[in-house]
């Protein structure tokens, strides 16, 4: 019997077209903010139609054989590649939308329409952006706040999940991994060489909470911003930080408009309002609702995971696990023995924590904190940051930034402060408590996260206390004031200038390989005030109430 002949390989051969529309394209594909399966399909299609996919970049810039860099957006791009390298790159830097549209149309489209303008990430805009929220990676790691951290959630031990911090779209993009390389909390900028005059100037500038400059936008389009706000929470709970952040950026832009939106054409040229959001606005204006939101609200899984994600300390991964266990309500969670003590506290006071705090009450509590702190340590500086310092009429929580001008007396202050505040029934439940100033670890920054009560009431509010050494205080104050958009722009700008910026300092970046970001040096750039940080980076100075970008 004659052996069977193998079928001709015509089908396989037909899939490869070296003269296809992507001939001459040698692409490096940034894998962030896109599903891996979708990414593989795009790579296959690109290769089938004459293109090539490069897995590595040349280390010295120029991209080697690479002609195109493809990414989801500027944020994903700058997570993978150094801004300085991109400036040297002479090829095309485009979004995946270019590839998608080429495949849809069957022809290679002009690339300039899909170019990623990563420089816009750190350029100031008159209108645009949004507040977001920052988070501690752990009780023993430094936080890079991305805004006024109003929505951060931590696990009891401080181990952060891929959680809902818009300020931290992805954990490896915003948190310095590995052991802390920070030096001791003592420095020349905070020791006895500092004059009384400079200490007084420091107090005058940094102690201002922005009380006299409130942020009161017209807010004539609540029908739109309230829907966008719900989508923020849903996408955050689902771990889709990219989409969550896009709605987050749009809200302040819409809030500031001096007119009622009656047509989507009125917003087509506004920053942070792309085609998708414009379509949403058009639907809301014409129908009074948004089908996407209704779809989410009618989906049991999305609805439940979103609900669980609102519990303090529960991130997207944990929320999904709880759903997969069969839990559907907050009452169900009460019976789950896998919850940490901090998560149980978040669950117990779920309704309390969700209530916003009126500005005048925050002001009174800030004064109380200053009085108690001064009684323990004369000269201590205590400022409430976040949306309060930016002038908002209410706050989701209180972010308290603390230091002492002499650069030394802050050491060991936080335990005494917490004990005194518990003694007067101001601080009630503990979530995270870590002390590093005594040993000089983790840049000497001490942290307390917990719940507090307004005097005479039992309603719980979230409060964070951060004590910084004098030489790191400006960075902490800047980071914990926010907002998210400003902090992201400053970090990207710092990166483009060869620095790494976080809430503990501005550091010289160490070189990486293949165009990728390296680590950071031990040395901190001296900046006594927030303005010094702005000036060092070459970014226009913004008063706290001007930072609602």
From Swiss-Prot:
Binding site for Mn(2+): 397, 399, 464
Induction of synthesis: By UV treatment and methyl methanesulfonate (MMS).
Active site per the UniProt annotation: 280
Region (DNA-binding): 233-247, 315-318, 438-479
Keyword annotations of the record: DNA damage, DNA repair, DNA replication, DNA synthesis, DNA-binding, DNA-directed DNA polymerase, Lyase, Manganese, Metal-binding, Nucleotidyltransferase, Nucleus, Transferase
GO molecular function per UniProt: 5'-deoxyribose-5-phosphate lyase activity; DNA binding; DNA-directed DNA polymerase activity; manganese ion binding
One Gene Ontology term, aspect cellular component: nucleus
Cofactor needs: Mn(2+)
Organs and tissues of expression: Expressed in proliferating tissues. Expressed in roots, root apex, young leaves, shoot apical meristem (SAM), flag leaves and panicles.
CDD domains: NT_POLXc
Outcome of swapping residue 399 to A: Loss of polymerase activity
Domain annotation BRCT: ranges: 17-116
Gene3D superfamilies xref list: 5' to 3' exonuclease, C-terminal subdomain, Beta Polymerase, domain 2, BRCT domain, DNA polymerase beta, N-terminal domain-like, DNA polymerase, thumb domain
Biased composition (Basic and acidic residues): 149-175
The enzyme's E.C. designation: 2.7.7.7, 4.2.99.-
Subcellular location, record wording: Nucleus
InterPro entries with a match to the protein in the record: BRCT_dom, BRCT_dom_sf, DNA-dir_DNA_pol_X, DNA_pol-X_BS, DNA_pol_b-like_N, DNA_pol_B_palm_palm, DNA_pol_lambd_fingers_domain, DNA_pol_lamdba_lyase_dom_sf
Outcome following mutation: residue 397 to A: Loss of polymerase activity
Family listed: Belongs to the DNA polymerase type-X family.
The protein's name: DNA polymerase lambda
Source organism of this protein record: Oryza sativa subsp. japonica (Rice)
Gene behind the chain: POLL
């Amino acid at each position: 019997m004659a052996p069977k002949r193998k079928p001709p390989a015509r089908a396989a051969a037909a899939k490869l077209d070296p003269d296809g529309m992507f001939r001459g394209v040698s692409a490096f594909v940034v894998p962030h903010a896109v599903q891996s399966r979708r990414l593989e399909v795009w790579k296959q299609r690109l290769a089938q139609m004459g293109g090539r996919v490069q897995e590595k970049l040349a280390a010295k810039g120029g991209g080697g054989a690479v002609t195109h860099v493809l990414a989801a957006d500027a944020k994903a791009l700058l997570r993978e590649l150094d801004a300085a390298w991109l400036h040297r790159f002479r090829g095309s830097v485009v979004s995946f939308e270019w590839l998608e549209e080429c495949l849809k149309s069957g022809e290679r489209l002009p690339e300039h329409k899909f170019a990623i303008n990563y420089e816009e990430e750190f350029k100031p805009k008159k209108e645009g952006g949004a507040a977001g929220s920052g988070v501690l990676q752990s009780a023993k790691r430094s936080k890079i706040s991305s805004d006024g951290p109003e929505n951060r959630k931590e696990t009891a031990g401080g181990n952060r999940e891929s959680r809902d911090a818009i300020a931290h779209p992805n954990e490896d993009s915003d948190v310095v991994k590995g052991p802390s390389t920070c030096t001791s909390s003592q420095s020349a900028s905070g020791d006895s060489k500092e004059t009384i005059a400079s200490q007084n100037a420091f107090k005058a500038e940094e102690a201002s909470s922005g009380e006299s400059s409130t942020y009161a936008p017209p807010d004539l389009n609540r029908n739109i911003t309230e829907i966008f706000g719900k989508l923020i929470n849903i996408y955050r709970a689902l771990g889709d930080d990219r989409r969550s952040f896009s709605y987050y950026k749009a809200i302040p832009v819409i809030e500031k408009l001096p007119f009622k939106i009656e047509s989507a054409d009125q917003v087509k040229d506004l920053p942070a309002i792309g085609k998708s959001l414009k379509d949403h606005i058009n639907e809301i204006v014409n129908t009074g609702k948004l089908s996407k939101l209704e779809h989410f609200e009618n989906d049991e899984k999305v609805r439940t995971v979103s609900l669980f994600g609102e519990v303090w300390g529960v991130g997207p991964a944990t929320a999904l696990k709880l759903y997969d266990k069969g839990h559907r309500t907050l009452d169900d969670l009460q019976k789950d023995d896998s919850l940490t003590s901090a998560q149980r506290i978040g669950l117990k006071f779920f309704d309390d924590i969700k209530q916003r705090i009126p500005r005048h009450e925050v002001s009174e509590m800030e004064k109380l904190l200053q009085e108690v702190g001064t009684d323990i340590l004369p000269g201590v500086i205590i400022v409430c940051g976040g949306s309060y310092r930016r002038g908002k009429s209410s706050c989701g929580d209180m972010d308290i930034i603390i230091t002492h001008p002499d650069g030394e007396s802050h050491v060991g202050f936080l335990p005494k402060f917490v004990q005194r505040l518990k003694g007067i029934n101001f601080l009630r439940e503990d979530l995270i408590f870590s002390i590093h100033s005594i040993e000089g670890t983790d840049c000497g920054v001490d942290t307390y996260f917990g719940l507090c009560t307004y005097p005479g009431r039992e309603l719980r509010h979230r409060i964070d206390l951060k004590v910084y050494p004098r030489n790191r205080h400006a960075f902490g104050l800047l980071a914990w004031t926010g907002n998210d958009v400003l902090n992201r722009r400053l970090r990207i700008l710092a990166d483009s200038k060869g620095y790494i910026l976080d809430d503990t300092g501005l550091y010289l970046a160490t070189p990486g390989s293949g165009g990728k970001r390296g680590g950071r040096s031990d040395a901190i750039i001296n900046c006594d005030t927030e303005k010094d940080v702005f000036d060092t980076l070459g970014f226009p100075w913004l008063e706290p109430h001007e930072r609602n970008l």
